[in-house]
Amino acid sequence: MTPSELRRLCLIIRVFLAYGLDELIPLMRITLPLRIGRRCLFWMRNRHGDKPLGERLRLALQTLGPVWIKFGQMLSTRRDLFAPAIADQLALLQDRVAPFDGALARRQIEASLGGPLEQWFDDFDSQALASASIAQVHTATLRENGREVVLKVIRPDIQPIIRADVRLMYRLAGWVPKLLPDGRRLRPREVVREYEKTLLDELNLLREAANAIQLRRNFDASPMLYIPEVFSDYCRESVLVMERIYGVPVSDIAALRAQNTNMKLLAERGVQVFFTQVFRDSFFHADMHPGNIFVSYEHPQDPQYIGIDCGIVGSLNKADKRYLAENFIAFFNRDYRKVAELHVDSGWVPPDTNIEEFEFAIRTVCEPIFEKPLDQISFGHVLLNLFNTARRFNMEVQPQLVLLQKTLLYVEGLGRQLYPQLDLWTTAKPFLENWLHDQVGLPALMRALKAKAPYWSEKLPELPELLYDSLQQQRRLQHSMDSMTHRLGQQGSRQGRARYLFGIGATLLLSGTILTMVNIALWPIGLYVAGGVIWLAGWRYTR
């Protein structure tokens, strides 16, 4: 451990003790060295004992800085790791930090583009429009056409900080199984690895640019969602240039009502956008918190969302989409047996899982929820309860499902904030039923044939030759099998004779030994000779 890492570790320990987070460690896990170490640091008392544990954890992460704040935000989506009260507190973490100097941002952009800023942009505002832990945003206009744009710039000093803190997180993750009784099941190293991947993705703005381009193409000319245009010629790994948008923050309910927005339609469109991304496109915006969503000023009675910050996206493969849709439909119908079977068929839980026990566990958790009116049931929390129950049956953590569940909670919470009477189930069920019908009906078959048509048109001229080669290969294989069967039969016959002769030879040799022991003079010699000859004959059959 380097001196800087040691200093950082000491700071982390001091902050954790100042907020009383040693309470997270059960007394039975506090070994003698830990007790001695804690007593040596007697002056580092819990200075926030009047606050609940979840709030203290949130405040400690805020004190440690942006890297730990983002880590806490990610942990808030992993509700299998913490009690609900702690997870709810972690969800309150805000990724807001003071902006760095605009002159430094200018130098960073010029270094990335390889020239003075005025070569490409006019009216660059050195005052940041928005600032977060990884990057900040400045406004400008394109010199070539005068279009208003925003420039997102990675913080110049963030990478070494991230690398140092992530290394420490890995070290701390190694302690978790020793300190917490359920530490191994929580797989702390995998949690840190998942977070590291998310951070690295966010540090590469070319990846975010590609994600935004894909989402924009998926919703081209859609009345539901608008993604700003990316200007790829000016994008680099540490700089992103895209169209500047104007809209009402989706969390500003008063402003939305003031412009007479159709709140019911807006809430329903949020649900439709989510399910369209997941099931039609297999590519969904996985960071849809209110800070990244706006509503267009235009056509408030036909409202349109505007999405920004596409650094984190998720995707599902075809099998996952099908199983997830069938799971949702089974939930709508309260068919818990079907839900249990789908989890096994999909490979999400081990194949030897007891279906009856799994079905009973799902029913126990979910049935009380469905006794409520539909507009009071949280789709996201049903999914959360299902995944937590499945983990008791050794369900492997599915990163794509964790992202999906987090996004669904965002979408549902946002929809209920806009329109409290939102019935997400009624909105989603027809969409899912139509999607499943499209996957198994005649249109799906025709689409599959059309997709494979170029491949088969290329292979069709080769088909007679391939068929002839296959028949010849089958004939040669059959001949080889016949020869092998014949040889095995002969070998089996020879081995049978050999075993027979070995048995006779062994019997004669044993008889000779017994006669020698009872002092009969002549017979043993003859038996030894005969037994030896027969044994040698049997040995020759084995060759």
Swiss-Prot record:
GO terms of molecular function: ATP binding; protein kinase activity
Database matches in CDD domains: UbiB
Domain Protein kinase: 123-501
Residues annotated as catalytic: 287
Any one Pfam family match given in the protein's UniProt record, by short name: ABC1
Subcellular location(s) of the protein: Cell inner membrane
Pathway assigned to this chain's UniProt record: Cofactor biosynthesis; ubiquinone biosynthesis [regulation]
Membrane topology designation: Single-pass membrane protein
Its EC number(s): 2.7.-.-
Any one cellular-component term (Gene Ontology): plasma membrane
Residue positions binding ATP: 129-137, 152
Major place of residence: membrane
Transmembrane regions listed in the UniProt entry: 517-537
Function summary: Is probably a protein kinase regulator of UbiI activity which is involved in aerobic coenzyme Q (ubiquinone) biosynthesis.
Family: Belongs to the ABC1 family. UbiB subfamily.
This protein's name: Probable protein kinase UbiB
Organism name: Edwardsiella ictaluri (strain 93-146)
